[in-house]
Curated annotation (Swiss-Prot):
Mg(2+) 1 binds at residues 116, 121, 153. SUPFAM superfamilies: Inorganic pyrophosphatase. One of its GO terms (cellular component) is cytoplasm. Gene3D superfamilies: Inorganic pyrophosphatase. This is Inorganic pyrophosphatase. It is found in: Cytoplasm. The gene is IPP1.
């Protein structure tokens, strides 16, 4: 299945949007792309939001029809992740699993915290730098449980099935064997990345341990079931999230016409990023 992107507006601007297309028609990045690319073989679709080594905080929006990828804002200003030495921007290709949702009404029995009201986050650790809106086929290896301001924010660790290392990586212990230091660096980055913005260090459940593949698959199934409840309108949050879709004809929010309302592609030159975003921050206590 081939997916393409439709960019509207200039990157690093409030108008920037990236829609996912299938057969040239916009679809929902949240609801229309199947979670499984090949369920029998454990292969998942991942929507890339943020390429590795970049700073713009891009995310699938929950508030607009067909859920394009936009840059997050705070008090009307675009948000960027700061550079925490020795890292530059995001440490991995960062994205989400479609057709998943971390339910803010349900407390996880082990983390003791509710979901963060977003699709399930994915960290793709392969060698290629991805692009915003890319739909990658990945296999999952493990998961970390970030506790972000009182919410469970799972971070699934996965690798592109076409990566040269993919055949050797089948569970979380293989990551340390073939990519020594990656899990430690990932843990450190998520602990400290908000400190330059004046926020406290993030905490992890399980003392920062990355859980194995079997545990991860259970988390994914739970989040897929939560999404099914959401898209069917049975969740209390169904009215707060845009559920418009173009493929799920048995849902009340199905719309065959939604794609025609999406603006035509309008790729403009990138807006400049303020030079202050280049600054390196040295965090006391980080490795």
């Amino acid at each position: 299945m081939s997916y393409t992107t439709r960019q509207v507006g200039a990157k690093n601007s409030l108008d920037y949007k990236v829609y996912i297309e299938k057969d040239g028609k916009p679809i929902s990045a949240f609801h229309d792309i199947p979670l499984y690319a090949d369920e029998a073989n454990g292969i998942f679709n991942m929507v890339v939001e943020i390429p590795r080594w970049t700073n713009a905080k891009l995310e699938i929006t929950k508030e607009e029809p067909l859920n394009p990828i936009i840059q997050d804002t705070k008090k009307g200003k675009l948000r960027f992740v700061r550079n925490c030495f020795p890292h530059h921007g995001y440490i991995h290709n960062y994205g989400a699993f479609p057709q998943t949702w971390e339910d803010p009404n349900e407390s996880h029995p082990e983390t003791k915290a509710v979901g963060d009201n977003d699709p399930l986050d994915v960290l793709e650790i392969g060698e290629q730098v991805a692009y915003t809106g890319q739909v990658k086929q990945v296999k999952v290896l493990g998961v970390m449980a970030l506790l972000d301001e009182g919410e469970t924010d799972w971070k699934v660790i996965a690798i592109d099935i076409n990566d040269p290392l993919a055949p050797k990586l089948n569970d979380i212990e293989d990551v340390e064997k073939h990519l020594p230091g990656l899990l430690r660096a990932t843990n450190e980055w998520f602990r400290i990345y908000k400190i330059p913005d004046g926020k406290p260090e993030n905490q992890f459940a399980f003392s920062g341990e990355a859980k194995n593949k079997k545990y991860t698959l259970d988390v994914i199934r739970e989040c897929n079931e939560a999404w099914k409840k959401l898209i069917s309108g049975k969740s209390a949050d169904a009215k707060k999230i845009d559920l418009t879709n173009t493929t799920l004809s048995d849902t009340a929010t199905y719309s065959a016409e939604a794609a025609s309302a999406v603006p035509a592609a309008n790729v403009l030159p990138d807006e400049p990023i303020d030079k202050s975003i280049d600054k390196w921050f040295f965090i006391s206590g980080s490795a």
